[in-house]
């Protein structure tokens, strides 16, 4: 089962009754590939994220993004892979315009709730900021800086 298909809902996964997960196999990353994960936790006494974002990028020798994946969490019932955000990064030097487009796509894909910790609108905004920051960090790491 592909990792992105494992979780099927809040507290649910694709395993049938009696099945046991015994191994997770991850491919080795390609050269000039790196990632970053950020989460926003406004209250230090609770380790519950208001929003989270993970970005993986692969760069060519010129520094152009040739592959990307963007995932967001705590802004929908399950973690979301946001293909439109990844597409906004691919083919670019990961400049401000590309990062802003990825952030906007992530915000648009989110479907957060309002709860005691913050409003849905705030979560929608902060997840875009986290995507932008995580993409910058991943790019810096992929360049070897």
Language model segments and positions:
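C-terminal structural segment of proteins
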Residues: 1-145
